[in-house]
Amino acid sequence: MLEEQLGDGGVAGIIVNTVKKAQELAHYLQKALPGWQIIPFHSRFTSLGRAKVEKEVLSLAGKGTAESRQKIRDRLVIVGTQVIEQSLDVDFDLMITELSPMDLLLQRIGRLHRHKDRVRPKNLEEPVCHVLIPGDKKTDRSVSAVYSDWLQYQTEKHLPQSIDIPEDIPRLVNAVYKDADESDQLQEEQDKYHNYLNEEKGKEDKAEIAILAPPYKKLRMDHGINGLKISNAKTSEERGLATVRDIKPSISCILLKGEKAGAFRPVDDEHMLLKSDQKLSFREVQTLLKEVISLPISIPYEAAETELEQTTKNRFPLWMDNPIMKDRLILVLNEKGDAELAGFNLHYSTEFGLESRKIR
């Protein structure tokens, strides 16, 4: 479809619901469409790496100048995740997206033909968005970890063939999020709806525990800064819940490439050489803080944290004396960008970000 639709040029945006899918699809398209520009864009880059990719995406698919908007862009495909829908001012001639809850889906569609004065290929002058509906929902459970089954079901049910934006937005969003009439539901629908209600109730309970209290002097004295974060948490269980996010926790760590004899390089700055037996300068610390990345939640949290803590403590004790670096975790890759961690093979590249595969 891409070869046909973008045969005369243009930019396609493909948005999927997981980073792993985005990476796999980008790999596939690079092989299937030689000579095309395929750019993966997702959250699993280092802070600096993501900023570089974002800059490239905006330069190629952003608003640009009035002169650039009169030129047809040539066979560019951006394969991304939710990061595309959130804030980027990008403009796609064609969009392909996996199903997501209606409000988020409409945000994605808002990146289609976003700039009205842009010249587009003849066959892409009308905005078209292809929404991919999961085939075997019981087999593919990856989306359930991201979005509610009920919201996905409701969105698929109420998704029309054509949409007028922004006129249709309130009606469509309300159709998905309104209270359901359970008397008309099948058992499977009721199960999805009740699970959704329980999830929402759980979020509300966590939010109540973590509500900021007024900045009373006694609270500051008793609990310090943490006291401001956890207002009425009286038990250790409540304190734990107050720090739990709505998604599974992931580990943030600094990525380095290991050289020889205790020398290391930041993955995004190969010109900087760091020695583990030397104190870090302020500039070096600032660089390292830009090399932070969140590990996939599929990696066992406790096992990975324990392994990284041990590695960091043993290999970088002098660095940890720096107050800014204290409690930071460091993941060391080999010169090819590979590492093993908690039963997973990891590989980092500036093009695809951090990829993971479970060791069988």
What spans do the regions from the language model cover?
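Flexible glycine/serine/alanine-rich "lid" or loop that lines and gates the nucleotide-sugar donor pocket
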Residues: 89
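Short amphipathic alpha-helical segments, especially helix-boundary/capping motifs
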Residues: 30-33, 82-86
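C-terminal helicase lobe and adjacent C-terminal extensions/tails of nucleic-acid helicase motors
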Residues: 1-15, 20-59, 65-67, 71, ...
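Conserved two-lobed SF2 helicase motor
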Residues: 69-85
